[in-house]
Amino acid sequence: MASQSVAGIGGRTAAGEARAASPESRRMVAIWLFVSFALIVEMFGIGAYVQNMNAGLSIMAWQPVSGVIPPLTHAAWERMFALYKTIPQYKELNRGMDLAGFKAIFWPEWIHRMWGRLLGFDFGVPLVWFLWTGRIERRLRPWLVTLFVLGGVQGLIGWWMVASGFQPGLTEVSVFRLSVHYCFATLLAIAVFATALTVLKPAETRLPPEEAARYAGARRMAMGSIVLISIAIVAGTFLSGTHAYTIDNTFPLMQGRWVPPDYAALHPFWKNFFLNKAATQFDHRLLGTVAAVGVLAAVVAAIRADLPARARDAFLVMGALLIVQYILGVTTLVSKILDIGIVHQLNAVLLLAAAVWAWFELRGRPA
């Protein structure tokens, strides 16, 4: 047993590396990573709900350990509420809020932070166990440890974002920091998902080089889809951050026009791309539509091509998720039902993951 553990941690023996590369070990590690990906996707939903509730500023301290325990007594609740009363959001937006109202915004943010801790536990504990038992191939060990560290960095970015909302004159977090927080979370989710695919389908099982060359065009279309979806997601973070979904709730026109008359209301002009509600909504509409057209074109081309079965399935899933995504976006806008918008944000990550899957299935073996 001791020799097995040493081989697992150091990976210096052929037997240890063979165990890590076995189908059983790969399956176990892949399942763990897919579960982690699912938990991260759920975190997007919780975060979106927190934002819709304007609850993100309700907890005034970042306490990774002691913050696990919420207020348990009336006096503790009053102390927490008193801290909230010191920030501009309470003074300008929520003055007169009672303790029950404060609890209503406290709990979503507390759950959001607890879910982050759960993610750290879910990723960190199995990682240690897999390393100790030699279930992870040597080439993946530094990368998986890096992913765990990046998860902690995401927590720091989250607090950096929240802290921006405590500044004088501000009643919500910085739109720019919100975008960084969301985009970093998306990158982390996709990195975990792609790593799971790598574990499940190692290099030696990929397409032969000559076959991969034949599908180079489809692979480029998958990469193009990744780029288009990513750009639309980034634009969506500024729509969400400015609450631009609260205006111009018609489709496809805005205020009876294709381009809203107040698109360039802010000066200098560049601010409109990030801080002008009309502009951020128009940009997301436009970029989302461009992404939809581009992705659908890729899916149609993939269906017509003689792709391997799994690659074809990936493109079909991407197409289905794209249609759902567009319907969710338009429905959120015209109905003003924010819960649909939460699903829209969740589905965006799944759509991007499907595009990554399609690209991954067309990769060739190393020469």
Swiss-Prot record:
EC class, as a word, reads oxidoreductase
Q: Which domain of life is it from?
A: Bacteria
Q: Which residues bind heme?
A: H284, H344
Indicate yes or no for the key word Membrane: yes
| Known catalytic reactions | Fe(II)-heme o + 2 A + H2O = Fe(II)-heme a + 2 AH2
Write one Gene Ontology MF term: oxidoreductase activity, acting on NAD(P)H, heme protein as acceptor
Task: Name residues in a coiled coil.
Answer: none
Q: Which GO terms describe its biological process?
A: heme A biosynthetic process
Task: Note whether Cell membrane occurs among the keywords.
Answer: yes
Topological type in the membrane: Multi-pass membrane protein
Q: Which UniProt keywords apply?
A: Cell membrane, Heme biosynthesis, Iron, Membrane, Metal-binding, Oxidoreductase, Transmembrane, Transmembrane helix
Give the EC number(s) listed in the UniProt record: 1.17.99.9
Q: What cofactor does this chain's UniProt record say it requires?
A: heme b
Check the record and name the InterPro entries matching this protein.
COX15/CtaA_fam, HemeA_Synthase_type2
Pathway per its UniProt entry is: Porphyrin-containing compound metabolism; heme A biosynthesis; heme A from heme O: step 1/1
> Where in or outside the cell is it found?
Cell membrane
Cellular component per GO? Answer: plasma membrane
For this protein, the parts annotated as crossing the membrane are 28-48, 114-134, 143-163, 180-200, 221-241, 286-306, 314-334, 340-360
Q: What does this protein do?
A: Catalyzes the conversion of heme O to heme A by two successive hydroxylations of the methyl group at C8. The first hydroxylation forms heme I, the second hydroxylation results in an unstable dihydroxymethyl group, which spontaneously dehydrates, resulting in the formyl group of heme A.
Subunit structure and binding partners: Interacts with CtaB.
Please state which protein family the record places this protein in: Belongs to the COX15/CtaA family. Type 2 subfamily.
Question: This protein is called what?
Answer: Heme A synthase 2
